[in-house]
Structure formats: structure tokens, C-alpha cells
Amino acid sequence: MLEKLETLVSQLKATSSRNDKVSILKSNSWSKEILLRIYNPDILYGVTSKKCKKLNDLDGLKSVDLYDFLTQLVSLSGHDCVRLVNQFVEDFGHEALVHAVVDKNLKCRIDDTVINLAFPGLIPTFNVALAKNYTDHADYVDDDWLASQKLDGVRLVV
């Protein structure tokens, strides 16, 4: 699985065209579940590659494959996460790729927008609705005003 993911990442790095990236992702439908686990902002891993490199003497937890590894990583925390990542790298290699997966960035210039173009609705997104000019829609603009509170640069989600 890691070899296939490494090939996919190298194909995505080889092109700068957004349409080419979408077509590459569509032709590799097996990557859908992996991309979901990597780029979903609701799935958090309790470790970063920096911590794993710093504590590279910790190991001992086993994983069978990449899916099992990512499932275990969600449920663990602290040094257990570091042990799992370091043992996975020791067992399967591909250190740079595994650390990129743990950091939730494959460094192939794709994001949730590109992934959702290839697989609609796969990665949940949250966008704040921007305001419109109220003078175009309000019928009370010509009334006299005493004061209006100004909220400069504030974005609120209500």
C-alpha cells in the first residue's frame, strides 16, 4: 500500500495542473479512504513527525497495514503514538511518506478542494458566509440613526 501511495504522490508532484491532479486522483480510486484519513480535519493524530524524529528510540507497537496504522493512531496518545509511528517506519520503511501522512500533508500540492473535485463530498469543509452590502437590501436606510456599533474585521458564526 505504501508503494502505491508513494507512486500516487510522485505523480501528483510531477504536474502543476489542477485538472491533471483531479484526473490522477479519479483514476486512483483506491486512494479515497487514505485521503479521507489524511486530509479530514475532524480526524486528529496525537503526534507530529517532529516529535517522532526527536524520540526515535521509542518503538514497540505493531501495525499490519496503513489502514490499521491510521486507525490505531487516532485512538492512541502521547508516547504510544510515537512508538507506533517509529515501529511502523522500522517495519515498512518509507520514512518521509509516513511522516508526511502523520503531519496530514503529503506535500504534493493538493488540498480538500482538489480532493472534493475528484471525490465529491469526501472531505468535509466549513466556510464562513460573507456579508453583503446592507444598503442594497434594507428598507430603513433613509431613517435617522443615533449610533451604530462598528465591528471592524470580525467574523462571526451564529
Question: Whereabouts are the PLM-identified features?
Answer:
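N-terminal nucleic-acid-engaging modules of covalent nucleotidyltransferase systems
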Residues: 1-158
